[in-house]
Amino acid sequence: MSNVVTRFAPSPTGHLHIGGARTAIFNWLLARHFGGRFVLRIEDTDTERSKQEYTDSILASMKWLGLDWDGDLIYQSERFDIYNSYIDRLLESGHAYWCECPPDEVEKMREEARAKGLKPRYNGRCRSRDLGPGDGRVVRLKAPAEGRIVFDDLVKGTVAFDVAELDDMVLRRSDGAPTYNLAVVVDDATMGVTHVLRGDDHLSNTPKQILLYQALGFDLPRFGHVPMILGPDRKKLSKRHGAKAVIEYEQYGLLPQALVNYLVRLGWSHGDQEIFALEELVEKFGTENLNSSAAGFDPDKLEWLNGHYLRETSPEELARLVLPFVAAEGFDVDASRLAQLVPLFRERANNLVELARVMRFMLVPAAEVEYDAAAVAKALTEEGRRHVAGVREALAVLGIFDREGCEKAIHDYVEGNGLKFKQVAPAVRVAVVGAMGGPGLPDMMALLGRDDVLARLDRAVAL
């Protein structure tokens, strides 16, 4: 099926949100699975709400997610002549007509239909009037008066609509601009799109678009409508559920492979498997495993999954990724230094922001170590400071200041004074890092270096 063509068609009226990102991922995976093409189209016909900054943001998010597209980027705003040529074709073939009914009258028709318990729709007053173009006039599709539209949805199975409930939809507005459904059908057909995967909030558009495909003599693509992503409370996902735009997840310190993995699993499954490399997703993805029931967004699970990818990433790559977050904390440090630190700290973070923060005490000079008051009160007692001074003397005379040497120096002090490790280690740990937590003490000491460690111990003794 190398002739498979899918598309993603966002509107640049906001940043790319996770629902749109999931749609893009599904279409990208389907195209890549079959060795087909993935088209990216910017639906910017709403000139009042469309902004270049949002287009730029969407493109940046697509690239960050690793979703490349084939061919040129398509802008609907540059294709009005093409849309109008197809509208003219529909007028010439009798599948469309001019309508002069003003919007307030059309709304009145719909209210009258509602009052009778009918679907609110235009009553077709101008269908047989043979009007031509004129100020304030629109072009409408002449929909069949009866019949059913039935199609095999890739997710929902057989779906049917009663044609009598459909409106004679507007194809060209009074200002000459084509409408959404007309532009989408013309674009998908002329670009050879074979499969349309989208959210089920678009399901009501599908019968209208099928009528247009039929009127224009185009072959129908396969449609698949995936359920919307819900919040943990099973209501429509929103920011109050912790959902963010893709750009916010990037700024928050998530890894793109984690977000892709998570969003794919919100609507697609392959047995009980949770973690997939991108290449594995391309290999295994298929519409037959798209879920017909809505999935709930779980920010904690996303955090867990991101933590997994943090720990699977090589130290060198993770250092490169966390570098800008460390810089945002105010530190000028090179990636090679971070590559030494991240193996110690990535178990203690689930995102890059957290990783940068938990390494902070390793990057400040001794004079700027921030001490936790409770930890100081508990560990740096008079006895605790005496142990810190003793360990300091043992460390100062080490020949090689490495992990093994630091560990032996602490051990020798403990053994030589008839003490237990738990009597000494907490005080030394607080002296070095300012708090009780952190990775192994000898590991941190070795990475800090002799001068820094001794300076930290001296400062703690003087508290």
From Swiss-Prot:
InterPro entries according to UniProt: aa-tRNA-synth_I_cd-bd (IPR045462), aa-tRNA-synth_I_codon-bd_sub2 (IPR020751), aa-tRNA-synth_I_CS (IPR001412), aa_tRNA-synth_I_cd-bd_sf (IPR008925), Glu-tRNA-ligase_bac/mito (IPR004527), Glu/Gln-tRNA-synth (IPR000924), Glu/Gln-tRNA-synth_Ib_cat-dom (IPR020058), GluQ/Sye (IPR049940)
Entry keywords, A to Z: Aminoacyl-tRNA synthetase, ATP-binding, Cytoplasm, Ligase, Nucleotide-binding, Protein biosynthesis
Catalytic activity: tRNA(Glu) + L-glutamate + ATP = L-glutamyl-tRNA(Glu) + AMP + diphosphate
One CC-aspect GO term: cytosol
Motif residue range(s): 'HIGH' region: 10-20
Subunit organization: Monomer.
Name listed for the protein in its UniProt record: Glutamate--tRNA ligase
Source species of the chain: Nitratidesulfovibrio vulgaris (strain DP4) (Desulfovibrio vulgaris)
